């Protein structure tokens, strides 16, 4: 590593990084070519961005790079900051499969529980964004000299307490790698918070100065992006590495991921009531396949956001966290998104919520039982040939066979289906002949 650093100091622009020749690449996965390049890039740049598309294996590439730095004693301890939904299913699980020789702790739960994890001697500590401000002092004293920020657009706003708490931990001398596939998806203004966190010298001191640089004032309250705003964003978010899924030629065509979510307090209450009823049945009455299926159905409905009460009315639950996860997927792609929703009342609720989030009722369409064949054909045609529809909500049973929806490169399962055949068939709506992109299947999971 010292020889490589010397070559860089002498002005050699891109000497091959020693990770490519001397590192053993532990774990159950063989790294893809783009992951080798990404890991070398991260190891070479103390403050940088990995802007590769979702599904390209950023987690493992950064894990290998961090492990290399730990092995060379260039860093002592790693803090991973990411959304709650991927703390366990993505980060802990991938670190276990990739770096089984390293110790990993998840700082979750109460303040005291989080502090105990930070005070222990785990080499990797994983924490969610809002947890950072809860145990801010403990993190400051925790000896973290590498901070990996995953889904970094969660801290795009430099005015928030969340951003300020994280910024204090990313003090001079600490390595910071920010990872996101969508650095300024909504607006060039979004790049400011990221740049100020990773390389503050790359942007003006004030947000107003940045706004005046990348936006043009139309009226007193309306601004529009400057014609060169994309170039300006690219300029400040450097050094950066980015791969699209299509550039990763050795990636499988169909990728799977799971995002874990907490149930809301109201959902937990109803969920426990139904479970208690099931236990009571098991203790006394005879359980038939029919009443067992009904109760399991009820649990699935509660987890997904709306349930039929015995009176026939629909009880709706707070789905803002689940919706936020879905919107992250929607915003992560320039293409379209299929969302499989098993229950009619949930799809009604979701259609309205998505239309509001996207600011256009025509951006969301629904196919399910009861939609006439001619209307269904029109929806599919519009989805495949026009740009207006961004999200298509589908009942799995209504979309299992024969439909081509290859304009989508993201599939989200809002809730599970009990039929493996139906699951495979539904995923094949997008992953089929005519698909020119790699397809990612995301499972939203929130049952306790």
Say what each PLM segment does.
Residues 86-110, 198-201, 357-358:
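Conserved helix-turn-beta segment of the N-terminal RecA-like "Helicase ATP-binding" lobe
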Residues 120-135, 385-400:
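Conserved two-lobed SF2 helicase motor
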Residues 126-131, 137-141, 161-174, 178-179, ...:
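Inter-lobe coupling linker of SF2 helicases/translocases
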Residues 113-116, 338-340, 348-349, 355, ...:
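Conserved helicase ATPase core of P-loop NTP-dependent helicases/translocases
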Residues 45-65:
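Walker A/P-loop
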Residues 15-51:
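Conserved pre-motif I regulatory segment
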Residues 174-208, 248-275, 394-448:
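SF2 helicase/translocase ATPase core recognition
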Residues 61, 74-95, 185-190, 343-344:
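Conserved Walker A/P-loop ATP-binding site and its immediately adjacent core
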